[in-house]
């Protein structure tokens, strides 16, 4: 009995003495694995963005009082990015970038680029910029889509791999943006009538129940693809979720989820 008692005390003593050491070892292992995971995550991201043969389309959204959207293209080498914009498809701008962990895994365009800093850099007219970002938290990435969040405006940006040259793609975007001229459309969703108004200059649409007050309409930024309008975030109404509208110029209409909205 006494022997068992002393053995138990000894075991407890050894446990108490070794506990801090074990905890320290566990912390060390945890820290190491966290660092490894971060490194693997960033290495995977860097490999993805530099491995795209034609680069990426970047659906860029700015926020605040000057909110708008533009399609950029970005092509990455190990430390440089080459960018172009739908506003001038043949013009390119090259600068440095980095992929790093700051407060979170991030993609940072840390040297001036006249394309990528168009809405982020201050100027004489816009001393705080125009609601854009050049530092982004990496929200998620896969082979067919990357999502980023701006550090200042908190707007979501989307990158899609290009299947053709940047200039060819941007010329299609520019042509479509210039041809789209709808100002207001309406359609039936379930048993309800829905109206959509377009702010073509700033690239917003206002959507909601037909006859609703302006304050009841939801304001959603959109961006042009080659033949559609892609919403920055989906709109839900009467059990149907809308995220992208195809355009029919001849019919003066847009369609999503099998529902057509016509100009009126």
Locations of the language-model features?
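Bacterial N-terminal signal peptides that target proteins for export
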Residues: 1-9
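Hydrophobic helical h-region of N-terminal Sec-dependent signal peptides
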Residues: 10-16
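C-terminal motif of bacterial Sec signal peptides marking the signal peptidase cleavage site
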Residues: 17-21
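Acidic/polar, low-complexity intrinsically disordered N-terminal segments immediately downstream
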Residues: 23-106, 170-180
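Short, solvent-exposed secondary-structure boundary motifs
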Residues: 55-67, 84-90, 119-131, 185-189, ...
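Hydrophobic/aromatic beta-strand elements that line small-molecule binding cavities or substrate pockets
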Residues: 71-75, 95-98, 133-139, 220, ...
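Long, acidic/polar, low-complexity amphipathic helices and coiled-coil-like
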Residues: 80-201, 205
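Preference for solvent-exposed, low-hydrophobicity sequence contexts
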Residues: 152-156, 162-264
